[in-house]
């Protein structure tokens, strides 16, 4: 860490005392006061005087009943280089550290920018942290300035620590003489670490980690790396506000959160030992390794090492020495991995080393994560050392020939099964710990006590299918193609069905679309389902369950409706065909029923990375009317949308559906109950998308649990397709802006809350009724507010259309297009413009 200011070290003594064991000086700021109540300015001579960790006198106070250890200790070991003992802490870096003590990275980045300081550039690394510190009352500026480069004083440092953890034992004795002196970086880091250690004990700051890493590259030795980015032996990190170029090829000890290095604690003077490095080349006394995402070349005079090997070595004065090449490696089918161990088909469970590395080979070696090891694949070579898996090399891309499906219970709510009962329509065999038993058709195999199951249970049909008697599905007791595997975990059973990829679709297609829609419609569903499953396969989102996907709507509904000849034919006729855009398979979104128009995906969902809304719209997921030649005007205009949605006679591909138009009434009490029951959970899930009106008239993202009694509800913004993007809800206690269709549909659920009361009814286009529905059917609706003489809302009439998010393919719309004579290719082009249906295998 390099600081340009000249620093004068002062021998000012600060005693760190436990909370409750010694009182602060009378002139110290009370712990409850925010840091902004005290500000610092440079000494008149133009320099801030630094209180250094070197000058701290520690005092041992009577121990608290919590068993807190002695105050901050100064590490005097010669093997460690203390960082920043004579350097100050900037306000910018203090803001970053304070904010990340209390927030994960996503939460910080999801906050809208509210600061207006003249000296804070929106593009600066510290801007988002200063913004969060301001919003959360941790730090602020004065006179329109934040002074990010100024130093933090002793009093400011203590106030920040008090905000991070008001119950912390970390207290400095503050006097008139030292309160406005700059605190050294080293001292601050030690106090900060102690403070967050106590927080972690309360499970408040559990996302913070202490790591030891070797720095391999930053932009000082790799111009391709943006400033603030580094590559360490454990992978890429960001380290904004810290200069780590001086520590390349050294081991450092840091505090980090979500891949952001918060603080540099110290550097080790001993020669670093590299582990699990991939050998990228060896020639002419030079050894080239690839590690963490960086390629480095070092002097080497040892024996020949084969490219693609994995090794440990010590870096001594720029030379690779004491090289240990891993000799034990194997390939095996991966059944499950959870970050702590991997279970294999033949070798069973093996633990991962603390420094587990993952690489992939191809045109170039790449740094990967454990999630890139696809469940069910056997394309990875694993390297072991001392009984643990130290590294993995993905030698080729896994092929989705089979797919592993985690089976949920009857309710589709959990993966845990209390009891398992299996039979078969034909003979089947069961293998446990290498012992195989054959069962006849109709025989039952029952598991009731997870404690008695120590190994994976394999169940394979010899003929016919396996029937799971212990759960129910839409068509009754489900029968499965492929094999079943059962393990005991956390007092319950997990069940996985391994089945051919195409055979999996045999049961997905009829579960997602009625077979009565016809052959052409089922072919369209088969292609979209295959495209979606393809991306789910490589997303590897269910690896901890030993699966690629699950059988519920979280992935795609599987085997809830029995496969038919029609669904099988649709899958076979389109075998291997997926939708692609610019050569990549797309995740082909689909939904149940449109209101006569689709929505732009960027006007429905926030950006996955930044959480900004609206987001960019994909060129193949755009708003489009559901009838050729129709023009309903600009549906983002409230009057046009109201006229459109109240018209039950619109000529649309979807208009035969009972969900094409719907109507529901909710009283003030029902709306108030629904909003207040769901508001806290939705804010915590997406804080940037729910904003509360502040006293200055500005809506800001702030924690909110209730609006009080509903006063008004109104549409603020609609998308091109007429879908509501932002809703304003005014209550007696709070007024909020709610964005994105899912938040809106969740807050105003048409269902009763609490004891008693009548069921809330949705009236469908065909006269049918649905009661206590889980969500508002769609965000394509308009409202009529019915008020009393005083203007207070008594109830609200919702006129709506469609069912689902409205992005991509409308399944009922497919049926309508088929009936209109449209072909398979025309339907796909209509719903996913610019894509191509291409064979992937």
Where are these regions (language model features)?
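Surface-exposed aromatic
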Residues: 114-118
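Short, solvent-exposed alpha-helical surface patches in non-cytosolic proteins
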Residues: 67, 71-107, 121-136, 143-168, ...
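A generic secondary-structure micro-motif detector
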Residues: 119-120, 803
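A short, hydrophobic secondary-structure junction motif
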Residues: 120, 125-133, 772-784
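Residue-level detector of short coil/turn "hinge" positions at structural boundaries
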Residues: 140-141, 824
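Short, glycine-/polar-rich solvent-exposed loops and beta-turns at beta-strand/coil boundaries
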Residues: 109-112
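Conserved, single-site charged/polar hotspot
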Residues: 2-81, 104, 166, 172-178, ...
